[in-house]
């Protein structure tokens, strides 16, 4: 390093430690308990070497204390929700729903990209989603390039076109357009971690297509439920959502749009 650096946030943690630079980990302490996920190893190892551990929820703080980390723990909130709050007024001006021919509160928004669904269970995942939502509500599925490639590799270009028709698959969207869809969806079905948090902040029902979550506060306080690829759970959840009996959820403490400011204040004062 040619310049003197006070701390490294996130990427480059191991190299920073070797260079004697303090590491600050944003979203520290999140644990899925699924050691097959590469992210799980990265989270644990980064927390071990971090001097500043910035957490988004109480479970993360408990995980860090249970693991006996040496760094100092700071509950600061969620920087992803900072971004959501900042861009929401812009997203409200998006024309994406008009372009896709859907109306607010009438469609399901789908995202699917994790290895456990795309590499190992792609056919099951797509059929479960299609069969669960068919005749219930419209679907919008901005497809991840990894998922697109997996469908084409498994079934070919022709069948990819068939899936596009069945699931209203569209090209990947920018953040503002996607945020507009997420805010206006009747329900979001996803295997993304961040979307679990964003839907809780927006008060939109979320069905997580995984068997675990590293963000349990979205289930305990928010609008999220873990359903995996269980068709029965998905259909029962959709029925509650359509009937208006889904839990309302509350926004966790400190998810107020000021997490980044708290982090900056802590680092400046250190």
Predicted regions and their residues:
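Nucleotide-activated sugar donor-binding and catalytic core shared by glycosyltransferases
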Residues: 1-139, 147-270
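Conserved C-terminal portion of the radical SAM core fold
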Residues: 144
């Amino acid at each position: 390093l040619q310049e003197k650096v006070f701390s490294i946030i996130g990427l480059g943690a191991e190299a920073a430690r070797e260079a004697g630079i303090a590491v600050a980990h944003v979203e520290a302490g999140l644990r899925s308990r699924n050691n097959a996920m590469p992210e799980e190893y990265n989270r644990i190892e980064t927390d071990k070497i971090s001097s500043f551990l910035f957490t988004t929820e109480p479970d993360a703080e408990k995980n860090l204390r249970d693991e006996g980390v040496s760094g100092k723990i700071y509950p600061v909130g969620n920087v992803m929700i900072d971004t959501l709050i900042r861009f929401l007024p812009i997203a409200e001006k998006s024309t994406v729903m008009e372009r896709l021919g859907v109306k607010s509160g009438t469609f399901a928004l789908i995202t699917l990209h994790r290895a456990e669904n795309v590499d190992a269970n792609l056919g099951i995942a797509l059929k479960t989603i299609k069969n669960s939502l068919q005749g219930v509500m419209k679907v919008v599925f901005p497809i991840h390039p990894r998922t697109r490639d997996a469908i084409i590799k498994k079934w070919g270009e022709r069948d990819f076109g068939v899936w596009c028709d069945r699931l209203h698959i569209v090209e990947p969207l920018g953040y503002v357009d996607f945020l507009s869809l997420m805010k206006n969806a009747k329900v979001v079905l996803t295997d993304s971690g961040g979307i679990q948090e964003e839907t809780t902040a927006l008060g939109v029902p979320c069905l997580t297509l995984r068997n675990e979550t590293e963000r349990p506060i979205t289930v305990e306080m928010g609008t999220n439920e873990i359903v995996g690829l269980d068709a029965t759970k998905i259909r029962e959840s959709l029925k509650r959502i359509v009937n208006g009996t889904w839990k309302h959820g509350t926004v966790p403490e400190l998810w107020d749009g000021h997490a980044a400011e708290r982090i900056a204040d802590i680092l400046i004062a250190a």
